[in-house]
Each structure stands twice: as C-alpha cells, then as structure tokens.
C-alpha cells in the first residue's frame, strides 16, 4: 500500500473529464479546490465532475476544500501597477487613497495597531518584502528589502505576527457551509496561527453537520511555526508552505 498521498489542485487545465480521468489513473488521491478563487457555481461544477469520474472509475478520490483564510490586501494604483527597487521607501496606509509610486491603501483597518517597527510584510505571495521603519498616524513607512512589480489588490502576509482578527471570515463560513453540503472530505485551513484557530474551525464544522470532515492546518507564518505542536494536537494533519525564493533575504 502506498502511504504517500498525492494532492492535485483542480483548475482550468484539469476540470475536464478526460484530463481528470488520466490524473486519477496516474495516482491522484485527493482533488483540491482553491476557494481563494472562483464562485460556488464554478466549484459545484468541479465537485460534480470529480464525483462522476471517481464513481465511474470506482476510485475513492477525496475532495479537499482549501479556504481563503484571513485576507489582507493592498488596494489599487493609479496606473494598475508600480515597480519597486531594493532600498526604496514605500508606505502602507489605512487612508482610502489611490496608490502611487510612494504609497498604497490596505484593506485592514487595524494594520497600524498590529505592526511594530522592524516587522516584515510580504506582498504578492512574498515576491515583495517590506520592513517597517516607522509608524506615523495611519501610515506604516517601510524599506523595500526585495523589490519587483507590484500590481492592484495583491495579498499581504505577516510572517512574524498574529493579527487581531476573528479567524473565520464571512466568506470562509459561507464556503464551509457549501463544503458541508457537498460532503467534502478535508478542509485545508489557510494561515493557521494558533490552536484556537483550529478549535474555532472544528466547532463551526461540528455545529453545522461537518463532524466527519478532517482539518489540515496550513502553516504559513511564524506564529504557526511557533505553535505547531499544539496545532497538531487538534488538527488532523498539517500542510507547510515554503517561500523558497525568500531564503536570500533571511536574516
């Protein structure tokens, strides 16, 4: 029996019956659906297709719902994007402005309260690395540690912080109810920071008919690493995310 399982993300290239059939025959064990993108209608089509093919092949392919998780994003720029260079100064602000070469708005109103000087902010999946130099009013004035192209509505991650928010957003709750209705097998919980995050998710699933759904906690920040042992006490498994391109910038 093969103990290592293969998880495959189902996207535009694979959401076809012939492609999915070949993937299952090649060894796919779990079909992952990324709820950071797509509507419930689109995901319903994928789930129906997975169930159809696994029944046809008599293969017990599991379905994993990967949550969007707590979402922190920058807003928009005047021209849609900018170029940042190493050593530049760039400001994140909670003021509602249209971004430019010097600053951009964020969607998290408590950003300034939660940050401190020296904290790092990873933007656009870690391609852009900022380090907080000064906190002033509604602004976090940052040094650009790793530059690159930065465009509208890119994600932000805070690897060394536990941000003060409720773990389950309204969208996550809606997605989880959708997953319970469709009898998914696993929930991959994004940006788990503490054991309590998993406990909150477990309670929500249990209270809404999802007692049989197993939780895979995704470790994506420093707090998750620091609390991984206690997270493992309550989660059914963990998944780690590795930003290998960040290694050259570690201190």
Model-found features: residue ranges?
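Glycine-enriched alpha-helix->loop->beta-strand junction motifs that scaffold or abut catalytic
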Residues: 27-30, 183-185, 206, 233-238
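Conserved small/polar residues in nucleotide/adenosyl-binding loops
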Residues: 244-251
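Beta-strand/loop-dominated core regions that host nucleotide or nucleotide-derived cofactor-binding catalytic loops
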Residues: 74-176
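Active-site-adjacent beta->alpha loops and helix N-cap segments on the catalytic face
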Residues: 17, 38-50, 192-207, 226
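Hydrophobic faces of well-ordered beta-strands that scaffold small-molecule active sites
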Residues: 6-8, 31-33, 63-65, 187, ...
